[in-house]
């Protein structure tokens, strides 16, 4: 399978969006990315999810666009931190949903940072250091107490280790971390799931109806069948508990 739903605007307009459901329930929306949001119809996809406030590469001076893809993650994390901790945001009564999409760990891995010789590992270490500094800074602000931060990648890097093949299951195994003052207590969940299950899981925790998200399953519901699908250029896979 090589078809991309995001490139089909008609499908984008007629599918369920987590952001749209949150917006319908009173949340303001903002999408933050240091790259080109017109790439592969990303902007069209975001618009169909009710994102109007979209921050992109051209919103930053040319001196900040230091990589092939745009503005490095360090600058973007600092920008997002300033937004969340601003007096305007802290004093606002409307809840918000902000998405920060990173880009520095993408090929060609040209980051303003060096601690490892392997280019990919070095870029991942850079983004990780930026994320860690972001979380550490948030923890000492008033914003942290009621904040939920969700962290997840889209996929692993197919060329690390070098022996990994594009179809291998390990290429699609990714973590998801929830943190923030809104988390009541630590917990590890080993349920098989995929990104499509984020909507039902989050909305159920918030007490928001998600019955029309028919493909999404609540990861925390032990009574549901848990599985995940994945695809690559020449095939697809199915994983269960």
Where do the PLM segments sit?
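Solvent-exposed soluble domains appended to multi-pass membrane proteins
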Residues: 1-241
């Amino acid at each position: 399978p090589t078809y991309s739903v995001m490139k089909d605007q008609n499908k984008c307009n007629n599918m369920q969006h987590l952001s749209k459901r949150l917006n319908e329930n009173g949340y303001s929306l903002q999408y933050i990315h240091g790259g080109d949001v017109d790439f592969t119809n990303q902007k069209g996809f975001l618009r169909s999810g009710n994102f109007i406030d979209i921050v992109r590469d051209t919103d930053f001076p040319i001196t900040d666009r230091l990589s092939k893809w745009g503005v490095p993650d360090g600058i973007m994390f600092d920008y997002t931190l300033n937004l969340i901790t601003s007096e305007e945001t802290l004093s606002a009564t409307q809840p918000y949903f902000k998405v920060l999409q990173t880009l520095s760990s993408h090929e060609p891995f040209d980051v303003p940072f060096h601690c490892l010789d392997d280019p990919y590992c070095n870029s991942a270490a850079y983004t990780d250091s930026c994320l860690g500094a972001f979380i550490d800074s948030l923890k000492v602000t008033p914003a942290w107490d009621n904040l939920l931060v969700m962290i997840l990648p889209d996929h692993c890097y197919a060329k690390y280790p070098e022996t990994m093949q594009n179809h291998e299951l390990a290429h699609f195994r990714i973590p998801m971390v929830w943190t923030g003052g809104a988390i009541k207590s630590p917990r590890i969940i080993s349920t098989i799931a995929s990104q499509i299950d984020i909507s039902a899981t989050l909305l159920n925790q918030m007490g928001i109806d998600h019955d029309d998200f028919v493909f999404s399953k609540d990861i925390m519901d032990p009574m549901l069948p848990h599985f995940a699908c994945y695809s690559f250029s020449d095939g697809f896979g199915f994983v269960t508990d």
